[in-house]
């Protein structure tokens, strides 16, 4: 027997319970694993002599403690609880440690201690450290601080203090001071650390009757000492640690350490909290701490006395020299720590945890600590809890670096790995990773290799092209030279043939040319130049350009250098220009002819005009050719000069081609604005800081960095960089480098990433970087846009200010800084090995493309220029984002204001563009307008943009045109009316049909734009006049201001009225037009007085509007807007010029609007609401609608006072209003040609007939939203019936009257009759044969011989006088007429045979239909539409599945999905043995052929042998080439079942259901979602469930039931003896003989049973089911012809797969019957009748 060595570490582990109790007394917690790790691995590395087995030496422990408590990054806060516990064990050793601890030495005290004796003077008191006078009672000379049982509330006071050198407060007694000085003078002053250590071991002085509440320390022999907080400590703690709101865990750990080591009093705790926490944080901590107070029962209490006693908010009177006072203080600290922990717990936010990802250079252990800290901070879960280990492990895997996470996911047996195992694996992967230097070297090497390969490939292709062209050119030269020789010599002369040994040079025999002595040797001379075209003259990529004359154009966004060839009929492109058209042309060249294709039309914008051209694509041509076709369109001129040919435009300018967006096209037509001559010399030199050319990049010095707030639910988005061409990357590289040098771009690492888009600048090869920030914009909070509206911005510019300065700020957004917390939002990917950049870059300034950038910059610039506006009130300063306009009344004021503005902009840090500046001019361009002399014009560039657009061919092109022209609508009178035919074509889903009306509107808009007048700038000091006119629902007007005796137009306004207003009479439409245009004009007038002039006296209409036309809401709106006399006034009635909308010199004929409206009555002028004296009839109408037994019944009636004239039931669901309209309409129809008084109690019917009917008709029976009104058909019928009576009076009466007047009696009778009629059975509206419809005329019946034979068999009689047969009293309809009638009815309804038969029987047709039922059946069966949609009723008999003859020979396979799955398992691969029913199931992560093959070879084959047959559905994992190849190699017959026929795989499909049902029950019973763990139990049930023969799969396979133990039988002796191996073998032999063979015979007998085949034969036409139908798609497709059949499946023409018979139905082919058809002819007055197939 050996002996074990006891070490301090092993001793603590053996008494681990005591160690945890001691740690708990210190208010800390320790873990055994970390205890061992720190003792054996961490602390020995500190270099203080700590052994790996631990020690109880206090000197070594204190040195380790000083290392642990080191401030800054060198400290180890996580090790504080463990070293504190070690110190407590060593300082006050428990019994099992005392034999290993050396005895303590008694040292004299050197530190200040508590007064030990009574003092004659009271101690001084301070606000921070109060003094307490305890009650006089006997106490021991040595106060016992620690109890004998080592209670948990006292050990907290035994911690060592930090090494503070400050001395405690001196005694207030002078004698005491002298005595202390004497004592200290005798002993040399040691270091502060030694003083503190010795002080803990010195005996205490005599008892004191007065104690001070100072931070306490327990020295040697129970002596109490005080060590106050120093201001430097508090300062360092506050500044070297994050705030509580930022990182509550770290600050809580600091406070816990301070409470443990410094032992502060109640006042010190308040000082500490007040320093480290804000007021709100402190209140929250105190509240949470008071919630943690526990009562006597150990549960949290809310009793105020207990809460205040344990955790007081005011200074308590605790005496710290007594155990009771110190226990109160310890409890207070514990509650304070609990409050800190509870207050620091953030709301649950798993998104924050998910956002913690591993950094590129972060170790897995450090990442795990950050992840655990996030769990503690943002979730209520403890990451150290074993129950949460799975969640933490998954987060660790998924949020690790991609390279580490992917490898961790592929670990074998992942679910059995602990978190420590995953960290160790991650550490291995991390340590083997590629360093940044190695990665950069690899990228550089790969780039060089790729570039070398590309260069070698280019050179090889170049050589190959040179050789090919050399051969072609040689052939061409040989052909030319031979032709020339033939022409000179007049015939063909061949070179004489040489002999085998004859020299080709000297023609002598005996040697060859290479050995000829007469052949000159030496270096070869220069090649003679030829005038013919050689290979060196050909142009291509990387070669010299074509010879002169040449011109470079941009085609398809790429510059192409053309050779100007006036001999070429068509222009030619050699490179692939994009899509080619179907047209082609035959090109004849020197080497033969060939056909080439044309390109599609290319739109080219030139300074000379717009050209749309199609080029000829000839790849074999040496150069791109500019032929006569394009030269003609360009109107090019070729001048031959001494230096060569020059190609210019019609005006002598060089030809240039640009491609740009249509919104910027007007810039092409603008004349270049040259900077002022004085700008370069004076303005640039005087204000260098204001210009971008001299001052560099701007920076708004007064604006703080911007913080971009995100939406609450936003998460980082990462989009990969789009592929970028080499040319584009080189184009934006200088811009990226420039922005990096200026500090606008900086490298970063961010979870956000958006792609960078290179945009080519028009007409150049330069690119500019544009970032796609659409996804970022979706996740950023929206702010209200405050950017000024260009529509009314110039309204603030008075016409008196006619000197202007326009400044365009350069890179305006880059002047605003971004806060560092918001910079990661705009990160993008950029790699440049040459610059050493490979990663992400982000913006430090406000980026372009961000949705809030214009608003943020506009607001910032407005704030910065606010002082300038105040200091210069005489100047007008307009700002639209980065475009600034300064206006003054004189040139001098403009110059002075411009200087002040430039100085201000330079001081503020903004930079203007000197190239675009317009300084002190009387005519400037601003926001696309031309400003001059107080007026604004459309620039010619804007006009040319609209004029140059081609005729739109798509809705998008039309919207572009209307948008461009709509910008100029203020200059176009009646723009809304002109563009009215165009707007309907822009709607989505509308057919784009460009007709004459659209072409006319298109031309009118262009023509109006050419004649656009100059508009005056609004002068807000003068009143405005608005001339309004209305025509056909369109409001038109012109806003003017007086300029002397003239009226100067300010804006032309136009708008379309809404559908309700468009249906009013003309005078009311004028009111609506004035209201609409007044609202639009208010945007320009800014609330200034407005005088309205119109051809109608509308003021009286507005004050007293007619109630029958306007609703109350609309009337109130109009009156509130137009009767505001302070702002709106009405002028006299004027006649307007329809062209200019200005008043005519002569006055028009006046009219009274109120009189006209009064005359505008209903549809019938003589309609009245007073009874007619000489009426022929006086009737009463009523409609009724009510609910009875859950069904709405309705009826209508017309009565007199005493009798019912008409009453009828209406269809179910009819409303009361509709019934009233029907009753009134019926009365008017019956009184046709007579004088009628009709009474109705319906306000709706009365108002419709008198008022609203005409209003509805005028506006097209539409509501204000443009929808159809209710009861449209009934209203139209009523309006039509109003004209039937000779005279008419519709009178309204009260309903449900009780009097005895004639009116009351008639109304009651009408109401009663309507209710009685409603109760009756309503007419069947679904009846197909309508009685009112015109029937067939029997005289036109034509009977065939077959019809006559059937009629004679029926016994029908022939009516000689009428010419038709009669049967059962009805005319007999011939078979052909019956077929046409029933076929038409079926095409209207597509009802089935039974329903159509029932409706025909119910309809009581006046004719007897010959062979009706048979014809009806044929019509329903032969309908193609019904065959494609209706479901099939055909049923196929059940088939028989083929089974194996023994276990393991025939398997069925299937995948089934089981969600949710842990560890990535979400599929289940199921194998079923068809013979025994034995089930094997394997959880998988993917549904692939690789998984199927792997399980087949590794699981099925080793255990059951090689299968002979496999059956499965047509899933991709089974039909894959991998699966089929494995089956072919192994000789397995793989049978694929019919698609969408689960019954074909019925056995495995049924077992899938059984397994999933069992798993569901097991998960519910076990309370877990890990179905993989419960799968064996589900398989056990499936394998032991009896089959159709009463045997379980286990019994069939093993010959006995599974071994079970009866736990209820106490006698286990019978189960202890197991049978021998021989007995098992005999049993299996018996099973094979007695079970397997009969079972196989039973399966074979089922196969021999006859199967009822399907009715389809070869050659039949069938419809095939469409299994995946889309919206409104027919259910069946076809018909198809059957090619092959089996008892259960078919193969049809056009579909490669076999189709199960249950998925088809027969297609009935209707016979071709001759019938008459009507066809159109070229002559509109003629039609053609043909007889043929229907």
UniProtKB/Swiss-Prot annotation:
Q: EC number(s)?
A: 3.4.23.-, 2.7.7.49, 2.7.7.7, 3.1.26.4
Q: Give the residue ranges for region: Interaction with host UBE2I.
A: 429-434
Keyword tags: Aspartyl protease, Capsid protein, Coiled coil, DNA integration, DNA recombination, DNA-binding, DNA-directed DNA polymerase, Endonuclease, Eukaryotic host gene expression shutoff by virus, Eukaryotic host translation shutoff by virus, Host cell membrane, Host cytoplasm, Host endosome, Host gene expression shutoff by virus, Host membrane, Host-virus interaction, Hydrolase, Lipoprotein, Magnesium, Membrane, Metal-binding, Multifunctional enzyme, Myristate, Nuclease, Nucleotidyltransferase, Phosphoprotein, Protease, RNA-binding, RNA-directed DNA polymerase, Transferase, Ubl conjugation, Viral genome integration, Viral matrix protein, Viral nucleoprotein, Virion, Virus entry into host cell, Zinc, Zinc-finger
Entry's Gene Ontology molecular function annotations: aspartic-type endopeptidase activity; DNA binding; DNA-directed DNA polymerase activity; RNA binding; RNA-directed DNA polymerase activity; RNA-DNA hybrid ribonuclease activity; structural constituent of virion; zinc ion binding
A Gene Ontology annotation in the biological process aspect, one of them, is: proteolysis
Q: Which residue spans match zinc fingers labelled CCHC-type?
A: 501-518
Q: Does the keyword Nucleotidyltransferase apply?
A: yes
Which parts of the sequence belong to the Integrase catalytic domain?
1443-1601
Which reaction equations make up its catalytic activity? Answer: DNA(n) + a 2'-deoxyribonucleoside 5'-triphosphate = DNA(n+1) + diphosphate; Endonucleolytic cleavage to 5'-phosphomonoester
Annotated segments matching region Interaction with host PIAS4: 344-392
| Lipid-carrying residues in chain (N-myristoyl glycine) | 2
Q: Which Gene3D superfamilies match?
A: 1.10.340.70, 2.30.30.850, 3.10.20.370, 3.30.70.270, Acid Proteases, Gamma-retroviral matrix domain, HIV Type 1 Reverse Transcriptase, subunit A, domain 1, Human Immunodeficiency Virus Type 1 Capsid Protein
Q: Which residues form the RNase H type-1 domain?
A: 1173-1319
Required cofactors, per record?
Mg(2+)
List the InterPro entries: Aspartic_peptidase_AS (IPR001969), DNA/RNA_pol_sf (IPR043502), G_retro_matrix (IPR000840), G_retro_matrix_sf (IPR036946), Gag-pol_Znf-H3C2 (IPR039464), Gag_p12 (IPR002079), Gag_P30 (IPR003036), Integrase_cat-core (IPR001584)
Among Pfam families, the record links this protein to:
Gag_MA, Gag_p12, Gag_p30, MLVIN_C, RNase_H, RT_RNaseH_2, rve, RVP
**Where do we find the motif LYPX(n)L motif here?**
128-132
GO (cellular component) term, any one? membrane
* ZnF endpoints (HHCC-type): 1386-1426
Q: Where is the composition biased (Basic and acidic residues)?
A: 433-474, 485-498
* Official protein name in the record: Gag-pol polyprotein
Q: Which organism is it from?
A: Murine leukemia virus (strain BM5 eco)
Name of the encoding gene: gag-pol
């Amino acid at each position: 027997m050996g002996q074990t060595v006891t070490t301090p570490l092993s001793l603590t582990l053996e008494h681990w319970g005591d160690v945890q109790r001691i740690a708990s007394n210190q208010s800390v917690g320790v873990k055994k694993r970390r205890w061992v790790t720190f003792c054996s691995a961490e602390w020995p590395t500190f270099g203080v002599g700590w052994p790996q087995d631990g020690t109880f030496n206090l000197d070594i422990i204190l040195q380790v403690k000083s290392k642990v408590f080191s401030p800054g990054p060198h400290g180890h806060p996580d090790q504080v609880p463990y070293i504190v516990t070690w110190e407590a064990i060593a300082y006050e050793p428990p019994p099992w440690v005392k034999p290993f601890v050396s005895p303590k030495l008694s040292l004299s005290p050197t530190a200040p201690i508590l007064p030990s004796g009574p003092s004659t003077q009271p101690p001084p008191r301070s606000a921070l450290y109060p003094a307490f006078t305890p009650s006089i009672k006997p106490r021991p000379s040595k106060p016992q601080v620690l109890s004998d049982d080592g209670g948990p509330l006292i050990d907290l006071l035994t911690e060592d203090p930090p090494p503070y050198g400050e001395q405690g407060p001196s005694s207030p007694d002078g004698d005491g001071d002298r005595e202390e000085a004497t004592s200290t003078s005798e002993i040399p002053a040691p270091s502060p650390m030694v003083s503190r250590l010795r002080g803990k071991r010195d005996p205490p002085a005599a008892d004191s009757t007065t104690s001070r509440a100072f931070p306490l320390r327990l020295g040697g022999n129970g002596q109490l000492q005080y060590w106050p907080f120093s201001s430097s400590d508090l300062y360092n703690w506050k500044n070297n640690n994050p705030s509580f709101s930022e990182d509550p865990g770290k600050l809580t750990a600091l406070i816990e350490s301070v409470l443990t080591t410094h032992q502060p009093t109640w006042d010190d705790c308040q000082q500490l909290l007040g320093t480290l926490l804000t007021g709100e944080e402190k209140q929250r901590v105190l509240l949470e701490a008071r919630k943690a107070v526990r009562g006597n029962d150990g549960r949290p209490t809310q009793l105020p006395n207990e809460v205040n006693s344990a955790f007081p908010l005011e200074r308590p009177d605790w005496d710290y020299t007594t155990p009771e006072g110190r226990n109160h203080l310890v409890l207070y600290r514990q509650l304070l720590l609990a409050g800190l922990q509870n207050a620091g717990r953030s709301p649950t936010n798993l998104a924050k945890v998910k956002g913690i990802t591993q950094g590129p250079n972060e170790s897995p252990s450090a990442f795990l600590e950050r992840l655990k800290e996030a769990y503690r901070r943002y979730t209520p879960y403890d990451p150290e809890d074993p129950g949460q280990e799975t969640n933490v492990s998954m987060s660790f895997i998924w949020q690790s670096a991609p390279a580490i996470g992917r490898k961790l996911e592929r670990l074998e047996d992942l679910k059995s790995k602990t978190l420590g195992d995953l960290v160790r694996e991650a550490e291995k992967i991390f340590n083997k990773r590629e360093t940044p230097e190695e990665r950069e070297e690899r990228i550089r090497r790969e780039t060089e290799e790729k570039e070398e390969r590309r260069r070698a490939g280019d050179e090889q292709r170049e050589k190959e092209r040179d050789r090919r062209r050399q051969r072609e050119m040689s052939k061409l030269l040989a052909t030319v030279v031979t032709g020339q020789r033939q022409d000179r010599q007049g015939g063909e002369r061949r070179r004489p043939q040489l002999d085998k040994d004859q020299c080709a040079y000297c023609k002598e025999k005996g040697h060859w040319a290479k050995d000829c002595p007469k052949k000159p040797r030496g270096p070869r001379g220069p090649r003679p130049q030829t005038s013919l075209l050689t290979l060196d003259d050909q142009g291509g990529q990387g070669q010299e350009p074509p010879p002169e004359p040449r011109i470079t154009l941009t085609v398809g966004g790429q510059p192409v250098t053309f050779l100007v060839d006036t001999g070429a009929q068509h222009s030619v492109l050699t490179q692939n220009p994009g899509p080619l058209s179907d047209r082609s042309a035959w090109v004849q060249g020197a080497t033969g002819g060939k056909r080439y294709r044309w390109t599609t039309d290319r739109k080219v914008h030139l300074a000379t005009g717009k050209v749309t051209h199609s080029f000829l694509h000839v790849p074999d041509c040496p150069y791109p050719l500019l032929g006569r076709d394009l030269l003609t369109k360009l109107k090019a001129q070729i001048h031959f000069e001494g230096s060569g040919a020059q190609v210019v435009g019609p005006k002598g300018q060089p030809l240039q081609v640009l491609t740009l967006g249509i919104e910027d096209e007007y810039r092409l037509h603008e004349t270049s604005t040259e900077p002022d001559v004085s700008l370069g010399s004076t303005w640039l030199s005087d204000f260098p800081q204001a210009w971008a050319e001299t001052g560099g990049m701007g920076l708004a010095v007064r604006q703080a960095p911007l913080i971009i707030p995100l939406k609450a639910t936003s998460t980082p988005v990462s989009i990969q960089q789009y592929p970028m061409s080499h040319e584009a990357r080189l184009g934006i590289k200088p811009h990226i480098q420039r922005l990096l040098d200026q500090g606008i771009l900086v490298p970063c690492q961010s979870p956000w990433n958006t792609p960078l888009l290179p945009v080519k600048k028009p007409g150049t090869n330069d690119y500019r970087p544009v970032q796609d920030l659409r996804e970022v914009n979706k996740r950023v909070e929206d702010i209200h846009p405050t950017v000024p509206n260009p529509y009314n911005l110039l309204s603030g510019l008075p016409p008196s200010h006619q000197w202007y300065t326009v400044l365009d700020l350069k890179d305006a957004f880059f002047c605003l800084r971004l806060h560092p917390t918001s910079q990661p939002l705009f990160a993008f990917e950029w790699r440049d090995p040459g610059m050493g950049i490979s990663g992400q870059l982000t913006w430090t300034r406000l980026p372009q493309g961000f949705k809030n950038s214009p608003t943020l910059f506009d607001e910032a610039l407005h704030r910065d220029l606010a002082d300038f506006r105040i200091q210069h009130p005489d100047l007008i300063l307009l700002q639209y984002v980065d475009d600034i306009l300064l206006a003054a009344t004189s040139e001098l004021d403009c110059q002075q204001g411009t200087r002040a503005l430039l100085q201000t902009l330079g001081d503020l840090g903004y930079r203007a563009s000197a190239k675009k500046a317009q300084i002190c001019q009387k005519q400037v361009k601003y926001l696309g307008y031309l400003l001059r002399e107080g007026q604004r014009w459309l620039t010619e560039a804007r006009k040319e943009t609209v004029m140059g657009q081609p005729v739109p061919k798509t809705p998008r092109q039309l919207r572009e045109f209307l948008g461009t022209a709509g910008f100029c609508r203020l200059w176009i009178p009646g723009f809304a009316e002109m563009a009215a035919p165009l707007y309907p074509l822009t709607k989505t889903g509308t057919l784009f049909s460009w007709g004459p009306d659209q072409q006319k509107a298109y031309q009118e808009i262009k023509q109006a734009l050419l004649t656009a007048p100059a508009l005056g700038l609004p002068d807000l000091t003068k009143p405005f006049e608005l001339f309004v006119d209305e025509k056909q629902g369109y409001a038109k007007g012109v806003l003017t201001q007086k300029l002397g005796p003239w009226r100067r137009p300010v804006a032309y306004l136009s708008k379309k009225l809404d559908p309700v207003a468009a249906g009013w009479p003309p005078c009311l439409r004028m009111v609506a037009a004035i209201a609409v245009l007044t609202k639009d004009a208010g945007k320009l007038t800014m609330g200034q007085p407005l005088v309205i002039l119109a051809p109608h006296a509308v003021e009286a209409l507005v004050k007293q509007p007619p109630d029958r036309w306007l609703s109350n809401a609309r009337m109130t709106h109009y009156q509130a807007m137009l009767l505001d006399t302070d702002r709106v006034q009405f002028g006299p009635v004027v006649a307007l010029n329809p062209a200019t909308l200005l008043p005519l010199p002569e006055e028009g004929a006046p009219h009274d609007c109120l009189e006209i409206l009064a005359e505008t009555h209903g549809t019938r002028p003589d309609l009245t609401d007073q009874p007619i004296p000489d009426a022929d009839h006086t009737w009463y109408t009523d409609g009724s609608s009510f609910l009875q037994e859950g069904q709405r019944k309705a009826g209508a009636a017309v009565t007199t006072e005493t009798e019912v004239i008409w009453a009828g039931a209406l269809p179910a669901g009819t409303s009361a209003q509709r019934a009233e309209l029907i009753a009134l309409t019926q009365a008017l129809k019956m009184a046709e040609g007579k004088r009628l008084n009709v009474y109705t109690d319906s306000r709706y019917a009365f108002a419709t007939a008198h008022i609203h009917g005409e209003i509805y008709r005028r506006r097209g029976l539409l509501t204000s939203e443009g929808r159809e009104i209710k009861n449209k058909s009934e209203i139209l019928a009523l309006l039509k019936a109003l004209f039937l009576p000779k005279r008419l009076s519709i009178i309204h009466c009260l309903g449900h009257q009780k009097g005895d007047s004639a009116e009351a009696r008639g109304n009651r009778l009408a109401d009663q009759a309507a209710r009685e009629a409603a109760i009756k059975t309503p007419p069947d509206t679904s009846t197909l044969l309508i009685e009112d419809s015109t029937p067939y005329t029997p005289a036109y019946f034509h009977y065939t011989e077959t019809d006559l034979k059937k009629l004679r068999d029926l016994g029908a009689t022939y009516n000689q006088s009428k010419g038709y047969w009669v049967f059962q009293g009805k005319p007999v309809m011939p078979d052909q007429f019956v077929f046409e009638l029933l076929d038409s009815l079926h095409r209207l309804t597509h009802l089935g045979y039974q329903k159509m038969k029932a409706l025909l029987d119910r309809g009581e047709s006046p004719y007897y239909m010959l062979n009706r039922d048979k014809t009806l059946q044929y019509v329903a069966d032969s309908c193609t539409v019904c065959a494609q949609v209706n479901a099939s009723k055909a049923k196929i008999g059940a088939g028989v599945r083929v089974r194996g003859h023994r276990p393991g020979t025939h398997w069925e396979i299937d995948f089934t999905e089981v969600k949710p799955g842990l560890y990535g398992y979400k599929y289940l691969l199921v194998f079923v043995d068809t013979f025994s029913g034995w089930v094997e199931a394997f959880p998988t992560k993917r549904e692939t052929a690789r998984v199927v093959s792997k399980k087949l070879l590794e699981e099925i084959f080793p255990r059951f042998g090689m299968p002979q047959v496999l059956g499965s559905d047509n899933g991709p994992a089974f039909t894959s080439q991998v699966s089929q190849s494995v089956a072919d190699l192994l000789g397995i017959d793989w049978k694929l079942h019919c698609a969408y026929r689960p019954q074909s795989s019925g056995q495995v499909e049924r077992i899938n259901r059984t397994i999933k049902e069992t798993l569901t029950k097991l998960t519910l019973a076990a309370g877990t979602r890990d179905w993989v763990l419960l799968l064996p139990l589900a398989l056990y049930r499936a394998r032991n469930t009896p089959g159709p023969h009463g045997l379980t799969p286990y019994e069939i396979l093993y010959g006995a039931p599974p071994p079970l133990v009866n736990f209820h039988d106490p006698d286990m002796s019978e189960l202890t003896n197991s049978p021998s191996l021989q007995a098992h073998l005999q049993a299996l032999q018996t099973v094979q003989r007695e079970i397997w063979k009969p079972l196989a015979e039973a399966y074979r007998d089922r196969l021999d049973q006859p199967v009822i085949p399907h009715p389809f034969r070869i050659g039949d036409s069938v419809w095939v089911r469409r299994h995946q139908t889309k919206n409104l798609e027919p259910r069946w497709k076809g018909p198809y012809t059957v090619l092959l059949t089996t008892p259960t499946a078919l193969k049809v023409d056009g579909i490669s797969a076999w189709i199960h018979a249950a998925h088809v139905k027969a297609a009935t082919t209707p016979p071709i019957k001759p019938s008459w058809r009507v066809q159109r002819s070229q002559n509109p007055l003629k039609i053609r009748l043909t007889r043929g197939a229907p």
